[in-house]
Amino acid sequence: MNAVNDKEAVIFDMDGVIFDSETLVFRCWNVVAEKYGIKNVEEACRECLGINAVETKERFLKRYGEDFPYDEYKGEMSELFHETAADGGLELKPGVTELLAFLKEHHYKIALASSTRKVVVESQLTAAGIIDYFDKIICGDMVKKSKPEPDIYLTAAEEINVSPNKCYAIEDSYNGIRSAYRAGMDVLMVPDMLPANEEMKEICCNILDSLFQVTDLLQKK
């Protein structure tokens, strides 16, 4: 146990918490939407924040119809996303490295619980030079049920051998917050694309403006 408080671990979401990736995803989807005349694509993307690739496709097909060429459009969006990211367009959120360094210094266990596929997660964390901070990485293709179900957070806690009630979860999306809360963790919300609604205010233990504020909070515990 660290000397700061009774929590032993911090489990991070990735997209929108560690990387400013959701802003880039929205931007790339808007390019594809303008090309093909897809309406309300930002609204569709917001509905999919925090869930895995399989469920994202299901929601797009439900919204636009079973004949919607999702795989083709998603492929174009992904290609544009990765081209932009490779050119330095995928930025770390402010305060990430400072928070990770603080957690290591104070002997927290650190895990990742991301709905994104493992190959993508590991590639992005490696490129950013922060993968070695994480004791365990759990991804969307490693669990049966996606967020908002608690599976991914329960698996992460099990992998680092820490009880869920001894973990903080850092999330930005509603589905991610529901997942961590249902797993029995104290959730710190750092809003990204969506502000905290009444449900989030009820189930989060803190709502913070940035990861710098997370570090400040833990320093005071």
Predicted regions and their residues:
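A short, Lys/Arg-enriched amphipathic alpha-helix followed by its capping loop at the start of a domain
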Residues: 31-36, 98-108
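Conserved phosphate-coupling serine/threonine residues in phosphotransfer and NTP-handling enzymes
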Residues: 17, 114-116
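Active-site neighborhood of HAD-like aspartate-dependent phosphohydrolases
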Residues: 2-47
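Short beta->alpha linker loops
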Residues: 24, 48, 52, 91-95, ...
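Metal-dependent phosphoesterase signature
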Residues: 60-98, 106
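Asp-based, Mg2+/Mn2+-dependent phosphohydrolase catalytic module
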Residues: 1-8, 101-104, 117-221
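Helix-loop "lid/cap" segments that line or gate small-molecule binding pockets
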Residues: 32-33, 52-67, 124, 156-157
